[in-house]
C-alpha cells in the first residue's frame, strides 16, 4: 500500500470543559481491524509522528492523533495545564469519538512521554475502556525527576524556556546542548512552557504510584536504554507494580527518548502492530513477561 492509500480528515472536537482539540484521522483504505489513538509528549504536537502512522494504515489500522490542550492547533493557554487530570478527561473524549466513528472496532491508545503519563492516568481511572494501552517512554515514576524541586519557584503561569525548565526538573546536564525538547529536525514544538505544567507532574506521578494495582488494562511498555529524559527504570517499576495480567515490557538497545522517530522507529511500529494484532478478539492475556 502506498502512503497515499489512506484518507486524512482533520477537525476540532470539544472537550468536557469546552476547549476544542485539533484531531487528525488517518484512516486505512480498507475496513479497519483496529483504531490506534496517539498522544504526543510535552511541548510536542501530533505532526511529530507523521511517518510513524503509515505502517499502521498499511495494516488496516486507523490512526487518530490530536494535539493536547495548550499544544499545536488545539485551544488552551500554551504549555499550560492545571492538572493532568484535565488531559486524561480529554483523552477519554477522543476515545469515545473513535468508538462512535468506528462502531465495533477495537480501540487502542499509545501515549508518548507526557502522553504516556496521561494514558496511564486514563487507564487507571477508567479500567479497560479500550482494548489495550501502549506506554512509550511514559512519565510513570520519578527516577530522574527532582520531584522535591516541585513546585518550581516561578509563578505557575510564568513562561520558562522549555530546555531550561526541563534541566531544572530532571537530572539531565546534557540538555544544556539541546535547542528544543523534540526529535532532531522538528521545529513545531513549544520553546516555552509554564511552570504549572511541570508542577502538575508531582501530584499525578504519586497518584499513579499509589494506585498502581488498579491499572488492569492490557499494556505494552516501551523504552530506549539511551533515553536521557525518562529512565527505563520508570518503565520497569510500572511493569512490576501494575495490576495488569497482560503486560509486556520492551527496552530497545541504542534508542533514545523519541523512540518513534529513532532510526529503529520502523521496528518499534512493527512491534506495536504485532502486539495489537495478537490482542484482537482476545479479552485477557496472562503475564507476557519481560
PLM features: what roles do these ranges have?
Residues 1-28:
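N-terminal cap/lid segment of alpha/beta-hydrolase-fold proteins
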Residues 43-46, 72-102:
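Catalytic nucleophile-loop/oxyanion-hole region of alpha/beta-hydrolase
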Residues 53-76:
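Conserved alpha/beta-hydrolase
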Residues 112-194:
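Alpha/beta-hydrolase-fold enzymes
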Residues 215, 221-223:
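Short beta-strand/loop motif that positions the catalytic acidic residue
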Residues 217, 231-240:
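Short alpha-helix in the alpha/beta-hydrolase fold that links the catalytic acid
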Residues 226-230:
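Acidic catalytic loop of the alpha/beta-hydrolase fold
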Residues 253-290:
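Catalytic active-site module of serine/aspartate enzymes centered on a nucleophile-bearing elbow/loop
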Amino acid at each position: 500500500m502506498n502512503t497515499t492509500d489512506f484518507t486524512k480528515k482533520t477537525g476540532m472536537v470539544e472537550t468536557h470543559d469546552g476547549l476544542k482539540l485539533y484531531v487528525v484521522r488517518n484512516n486505512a483504505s480498507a475496513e479497519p481491524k483496529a483504531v490506534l489513538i496517539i498522544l504526543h509528549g510535552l511541548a510536542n504536537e501530533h505532526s511529530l509522528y507523521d511517518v510513524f502512522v503509515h505502517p499502521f494504515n498499511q495494516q488496516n489500522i486507523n490512526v487518530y492523533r490530536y494535539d493536547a490542550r495548550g499544544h499545536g492547533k488545539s485551544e488552551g493557554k500554551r504549555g499550560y495545564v492545571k492538572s493532568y487530570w484535565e488531559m486524561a478527561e480529554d483523552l477519554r473524549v477522543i476515545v469515545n469519538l473513535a468508538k462512535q466513528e468506528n462502531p465495533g472496532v477495537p480501540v487502542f491508545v499509545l501515549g508518548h512521554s507526557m502522553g504516556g503519563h496521561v494514558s496511564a492516568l486514563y487507564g487507571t481511572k477508567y479500567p479497560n475502556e479500550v482494548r489495550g494501552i501502549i506506554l512509550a517512554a511514559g512519565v510513570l515514576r520519578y527516577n530522574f525527576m527532582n520531584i522535591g524541586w516541585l513546585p518550581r519557584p516561578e509563578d505557575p503561569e510564568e513562561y520558562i524556556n522549555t530546555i531550561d525548565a526541563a534541566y531544572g526538573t530532571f537530572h539531565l546536564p546534557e540538555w544544556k546542548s539541546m535547542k528544543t525538547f523534540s526529535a532532531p529536525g522538528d521545529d513545531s514544538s513549544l520553546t516555552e512552557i509554564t511552570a504549572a505544567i511541570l508542577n502538575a507532574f508531582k501530584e499525578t506521578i504519586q497518584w499513579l504510584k499509589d494506585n498502581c494495582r488498579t491499572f488492569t488494562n492490557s499494556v505494552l511498555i516501551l523504552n530506549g536504554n539511551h533515553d536521557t529524559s525518562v529512565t527505563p527504570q520508570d518503565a520497569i517499576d510500572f511493569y512490576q507494580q501494575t495490576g495488569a495480567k497482560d503486560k509486556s515490557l520492551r527496552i530497545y538497545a541504542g534508542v533514545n527518548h523519541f523512540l518513534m522517530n529513532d532510526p529503529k522507529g520502523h521496528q518499534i511500529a512493527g512491534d506495536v502492530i504485532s502486539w495489537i494484532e495478537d490482542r484482537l478478539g482476545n479479552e485477557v492475556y496472562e503475564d507476557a513477561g519481560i
